[in-house]
């Protein structure tokens, strides 16, 4: 939530544009990664440092059923909130001015959705660590197959993201068996080339 507050501050609350929000997110990520690295370097033992490194790259190896139950509740509640605002998200694709002209309270709705996303993300990251590129790869693929309407896109992305995580976890346990890789390494191997393709295609449009 400190990272969320930092991003909200840099983006002028809920009034920041998409580009400003992305840049603020990158800045927050670098800042808190630096704080984490400093904490590990100064106060962690070798085993603790290894455990934290696995957590930073994402791993399901230490997840227990009680934590998983909490994640299910938070994710389903957050998904319900997002589905409630699905039509509003459709309007946002045309820009804030267009959404406001339809009577949507843009700052208030943006704040609600940012807070919901922060709650979901914080809960999952606290359990499994930071697993990159899933939020980039899956929605783009689902948008290609199911179109831009968020009521369908949100559900499809949630299901496809869960399937991708299961496959990535299996791959992380088999690639260098009997040892295991962090799940984030597997998703990065898939996500980085895909992200490069997205950037290349956007430049050619």
List the predicted regions and their residue ranges.
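Alpha-helical transmembrane segments in inner-membrane proteins
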Residues: 1-205
């Amino acid at each position: 939530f400190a990272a969320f507050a930092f991003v909200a501050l840099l983006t002028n609350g809920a009034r920041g544009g998409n580009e400003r929000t992305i840049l603020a997110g990158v800045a927050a990520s670098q800042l808190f990664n630096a704080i984490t690295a400093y904490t590990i370097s100064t106060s962690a033992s070798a085993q603790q440092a290894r455990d934290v490194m696995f957590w930073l790259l994402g791993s399901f190896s230490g997840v227990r059923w009680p934590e998983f139950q909490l994640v299910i509740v938070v994710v389903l509640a957050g998904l319900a909130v997002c589905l409630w605002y699905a039509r509003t998200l459709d309007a946002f694709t045309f820009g804030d001015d267009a959404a406001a002209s339809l009577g949507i309270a843009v700052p208030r709705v943006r704040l609600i959705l940012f807070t919901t996303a922060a709650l979901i993300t914080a809960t999952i990251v606290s359990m499994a660590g930071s697993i990159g590129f899933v939020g980039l790869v899956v929605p783009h693929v689902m948008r290609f197959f199911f179109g831009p309407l968020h009521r369908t896109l949100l559900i499809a992305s949630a299901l496809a993201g869960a399937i991708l995580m299961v496959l990535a976890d299996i791959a992380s346990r088999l690639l260098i068996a009997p040892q295991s890789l962090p799940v984030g390494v597997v998703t990065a191997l898939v996500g980085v080339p895909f992200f490069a393709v997205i950037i290349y295609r956007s430049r050619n449009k």
